[in-house]
């Protein structure tokens, strides 16, 4: 079965027309710019392709989603989070979770080669497009820092009452999971219920994510896009889910 080739002004086909094999492949072509990306995410569609391939657009069924209420940190991660909360109360800033202070660096780290992977979908073109989206205030990074060194984090898209997770990395134990836990606290504080995880992995399932029928996912996205987005800003993200200026974190 063939998929449509998109020109710059071609609208996306309905997500329901995506192929079953490969699961979710919907269309190819078009442009990778913020307007196009915004239109895609609003319809439950995302780009995913390797360098040298055409621009490919996907909407898999089922869709992996982490409900914030279902976030399930391991016993060891819960201990780490409690320790970080105590350190925060004591004014210890050795380990911090920050928001939007190093978006491009987080993307570059997520694009790094990993075991078992021949390449990355986070190509220079993708990095440029999402950094432009970050400048417009809708792409965000959650970053784990130790002694002012970036050691882990994640990035994603905030549209209305929905957060679309993109990728994460860790150069220290649990560094990406700490960032995710603080993101969950922030989103919960601002009544954002779901994080889109796009595709199924055992790692995400271990943290509480589960596959949902695409139709259910699309209905939820359509319902919450009109909600106001959380009040993102550059700063330190605390365990309670509030963002403060680094000078005022105590």
Swiss-Prot record:
MF terms (GO), sorted A to Z: leucyl-tRNA--protein transferase activity
Keywords, comma-separated and alphabetical: Acyltransferase, Cytoplasm, Transferase
Source species, domain of life: Bacteria
GO CC terms, sorted: cytoplasm
Gene3D superfamilies assigned: Leucyl/phenylalanyl-tRNA-protein transferase, C-terminal domain, Leucyl/phenylalanyl-tRNA-protein transferase, N-terminal domain
Pfam family, any one: Leu_Phe_trans
Keyword Transferase: yes
Coiled coil: none
Function of the molecule: Functions in the N-end rule pathway of protein degradation where it conjugates Leu, Phe and, less efficiently, Met from aminoacyl-tRNAs to the N-termini of proteins containing an N-terminal arginine or lysine.
Protein name from the UniProt record: Leucyl/phenylalanyl-tRNA--protein transferase
Organism: Bordetella avium (strain 197N)
